[in-house]
């Protein structure tokens, strides 16, 4: 009886251990490393396991996974409608596509799932040959797109639309470089044959040459010691544009600032309410191309401290909200 019980326990234990798929601990046994890249992810639920598996597989290529939020809306739309090629990805859950950029998902498939008493497991797999084909085709298609963008002959070379077109080309070239880096890990010989693609650095250099020839008239009324004008000027410089004091320039950015100081009834602090509205116009078409505004409030126990806080707040608003808004505006301009 004891012998029978012992045999039964051993049999049950062996069944329990057999339930854990081989791929959980050794995925290359199921998907040979000669043909596949694999990575296992685990988590408290299936979504966590899937995301971990995808991120672990992307890490094989020696770089951290980019958030999809860092991809411009222009590029996201171009990838969605097929204007920019990234191959055809699997249907990933929203929890993955919101956190991982499309180019990091190329070639990845979630193939296996397993759950034990403690965790959920997922296996991400990449077929090397199939992914190589996807990357080569995408890089070539995108490079042709870049060439078309930079070789187009616009009616007005020194315009914001032309600048935006080169910026779009730079984004596509940058995407190609990321895919080429991935291809180098999969097949370095194939990657060598694509080394003559447009570089994002060379396209950016051409873009900045154009920007230097696009002066923007800048004037801010009601400014506080010229601070907003200074911060906006620095912002335009980051995009490569130069600021001018000549009203006759084609592009002009004008704004109005308002500062209201007040002392609360307790007289313990000094407060300042501030607001700003600005707009960029193209005098050739007498239209407002871009408008931006912000407001805020600062307080301090003494006026000098209040001035410092306001200055810091204005710098933060321009480098944050205004910069992002202008960047989005440039991305919205027609590039075709």
What does each model-identified segment do?
Residues 8-9, 288:
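A ubiquitous, low-specificity "background" feature that marks scattered single residues
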Residues 9-17:
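Hydrophobic h-region of N-terminal signal peptides that target proteins for export
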Residues 18-336:
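Domain-level marker for long, solvent-exposed, non-transmembrane regions
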Residues 1-4:
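Positively charged n-region of N-terminal signal peptides that target proteins for export
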